[in-house]
């Protein structure tokens, strides 16, 4: 993909996501729109601009209902036939029941995908599907990891959490089985972890989901850790 049109909501997270694309993408960015958050759910004007600009791809960050509406309107505009959609936090187990087959074939990036092959993750996904009848989202996976991380510190300290420095030290060891596989902290306490390319597909039972097709970045560190005074 040699050219992209970027879109996201006009608030801190949206600005950060698009800044990350600008910092790392090697092709041409031929347009960018920040839309009003959270009020704007009509993207027809922006989609018309994209059609006129003729990029080779669209990159979006629209969590929740906004992602649902964007995917529907992208398809309704006909751009889904000519301009591929790339996304983060916009197509997932929570939004796919509403986006349905309109999202098929779209690509995204995430630090956790439900088909990651480690045993802890296999058991988590199987148990979740058995109980709820749907795939878990990465919000659920991150929450599970957070619980297991805190539990590992509590167990190491035999339940005595009165000394916060000791609690922090145990948490930083990350001595637990993460759903993401290998998990560790950088010097600035941000995770060092892989990011994966995910494709929206149907599973063998016809349920919409995402699957891993490649590792985008291995042992990724956040871009600013060297500037952090924490060493």
What are these regions (language model features)?
Residues 3-9, 135-141, 161-166, 182-186:
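Surface-exposed patches in mature extracellular/periplasmic domains of secreted proteins
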Residues 172-231:
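Solvent-exposed, acidic/polar segments of extracytosolic/periplasmic ligand-binding ectodomains
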Residues 1, 22-26, 48-55, 75-79, ...:
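Sec-exported extracytoplasmic/periplasmic mature domains
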């Amino acid at each position: 993909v040699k050219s992209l049109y970027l879109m996201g909501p006009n608030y801190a997270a949206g600005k950060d996501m698009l800044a990350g694309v600008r910092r790392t993408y090697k092709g041409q960015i031929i347009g960018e729109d920040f839309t009003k958050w959270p009020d704007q759910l009509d993207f027809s004007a922006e989609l018309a601009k994209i059609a006129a600009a003729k990029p080779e791809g669209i990159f979006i960050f629209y969590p929740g209902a906004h992602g649902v509406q964007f995917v529907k309107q992208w398809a309704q505009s006909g751009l889904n036939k000519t301009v591929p959609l790339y996304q983060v936090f916009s197509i997932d187990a929570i939004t796919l029941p509403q986006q349905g087959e309109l999202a098929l074939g779209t690509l995204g990036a995430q630090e956790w995908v439900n088909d990651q092959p480690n045993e802890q993750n296999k058991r988590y996904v199987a148990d979740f599907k058995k109980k709820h009848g749907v795939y878990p989202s990465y919000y659920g996976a991150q929450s599970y990891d957070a619980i297991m991380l805190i539990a590992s510190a509590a167990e190491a300290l035999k339940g005595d959490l009165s000394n916060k420095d000791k609690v922090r030290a145990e948490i930083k060891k990350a001595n637990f089985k993460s759903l993401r596989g290998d998990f560790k902290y950088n010097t600035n306490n941000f995770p060092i972890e892989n990011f994966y390319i995910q494709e929206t597909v149907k599973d063998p039972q016809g349920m919409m989901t995402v699957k891993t097709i490649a590792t985008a970045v291995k042992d990724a560190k956040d871009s600013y850790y060297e500037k952090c005074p924490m060493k």
